[in-house]
Amino acid sequence: MVKRIFVQGLDSYTTESTVKKYFEQFGTLYECILPPPPRYSVFDNGPDEEKISTRSSIRYEPVENDDVLDDELDVERYDVEKHGDFESYMKKIGEGEAFIKEPRKTSAGYAYITFVDSNGYSNCMKSDIHEIDRAKCTVEPAKDENDKKLKVESKRLFVSYFPLDRLTSKELKMNFGAYGKITDVEFVSDSEGPLHFCIITFADSRSVDVLLTKSIYIRDVLMFTRRAVLKESVKIAEHKIKEQEQQNLVQLPPNHTAYLTPSRPVTSVHASSSASSNHYDPSAAAGYAPLYHQPPESDPLSQCGYGPRKW
């Protein structure tokens, strides 16, 4: 089965047709999924003098597709012929009339790509960086398949805190620092400003393992966490798995034999009653154990399987 590819770093206004057209140059696509950005209304009932890092009264509620959000509107540029005097223009702005709708964002910043065959997947993964709509994007194996087969240790934790507008390093260290020493907190930004996720680096990879089993809430919002793994680490883990599979093919299981095992042990009609003397029994090495005590061979060739047994 061809692996699914996770693409991140897409522009907010990139369309599904653009993403599909770009990746079709590597091979025939089976699937192209471009999730739309989530749309929320923000309600803040707290006092204005309260610090934003300590606010707990901010609520986020999803809106209908037909509703228009504040960040999807822009003020019309002042035009004397259209708006008259500047005072009338400002009055219209106050009444909510002098606004125009901006193009709605079509992308949440990531996509899932699946090719029909492995050739398209291999061609796409040859390059770490791809450019779509003048935005540099990264591609990697999708998480669900990557975690099932590979166990890659990492001290870095990916944290998405959407729909919160922003978080501080102090808040993150306060909530995540209880699980291990934090050495660095890196906030990610693009040309439009800071994004809603960051990378937390711990001193020990075991801290990341523990956090992946926990549910962390900040300001009543559940943090989305995943292991931040470099592509080089994934390749090393895949190489180790291939080496292990190759060793398993070469290594024979215990008591391996090329002969059929008889339904009952081979016994000798000349079995000796003396159990103290042990002699080499080639049939035991061929999978015929357990055997009763056998007398020594008179023909040395029969011990190596070149002649008939004497019993």
Swiss-Prot record:
InterPro entries with a match to the protein in the record: Nucleotide-bd_a/b_plait_sf, RBD_domain_sf, RRM_dom
Entry-linked SMART domains: RRM (SM00360)
Keyword RNA-binding among UniProt keywords: yes
Ranges where the record places region Disordered: 261-311
SUPFAM superfamilies in UniProt: RNA-binding domain, RBD
Biased composition (Polar residues): 261-270
GO biological process: mRNA splicing, via spliceosome
Domain RRM intervals: 155-235
Protein name: Putative RNA-binding protein R05D3.8
Record's keyword terms, sorted: RNA-binding
A Pfam family hit: RRM_1
